[in-house]
Amino acid sequence: MSLAAGLLAAASATSAAQSLAYVGGAQYATGDFVFTQRTWSAYFSNGLAWSAGRVRASAGIPLVVQPGGWLQYSGAGTVVPTGGMTGSTGGSGNNPGATGSGTHGTAMTPPDGIPFSRVGIGDPIGRIEWTLTADAAHPIVSVVGAAKAPLADVNSGYGTGRWDVGAGLSGAMHVAGASVFADAVYWKLGNPPGASIHDAVVYAISVGRALSLSPWTVVGTVSGASSLSAGVEAPLQAGMGVSYLLESGRSLLVTVGAGLTRTAPAFSTGLGWRIPLATE
């Protein structure tokens, strides 16, 4: 989802003095992550994106669907394979991220019998950017601040019950007819009950090229993060996307991705959209 959301946000940086848009997306991801069996998750996000001069801000709240409470989404946009959070069950002792689960080497066996709703509202996430360089002829560099508020019930499996806050840099530039976007944010992640999650650096780099005399743009991306738990490899994935810009200023982006490490989704696909609401 981060690919779709990020590229649509970048596309919203127009010459308009002020704009407001509805942004949303849907993503399906599947993989075994650090578990001994495969699982999946679907993520639906709805939010608003606002820009005025050098400032851009966005906020959204997700609806999450998954068959068991094995995965949780951090504010960094990364999947945290907790093994299921109950808010009262202690960890296994062998893996600090395996709350209430058994471990086999570096893999966790998901626990049985944890109360869990298949559909739930996740924690809302907000982001704000301040552009340092205003000259479009040169690379655009922005300071980024972000936060995830712990509003979802941790016992439902859809929230960590802790604040996540992040700060970093993002950039954009044109090279040989292509647009290059880069983003790196350090996240201080709150530990869910019974788990130990490391703070993380989350990064992404995307390259997009518009097809000649066409509203279509092809995009490639690589994204990842530092390790979230001791003994667990860092997630890394690659993806491709195709975006379509409508005359009304609306845009759509379809993506597919593949995990390059076990802790990333083995396969993911998503759809993102942006609909302008007001422009001055």
Identify what each model region corresponds to:
Residues 16-176, 180-191, 198-239, 248-255, ...:
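Transmembrane beta-barrel domains of Gram-negative outer membranes and organellar outer membranes
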Residues 1-11:
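Bacterial N-terminal signal peptides
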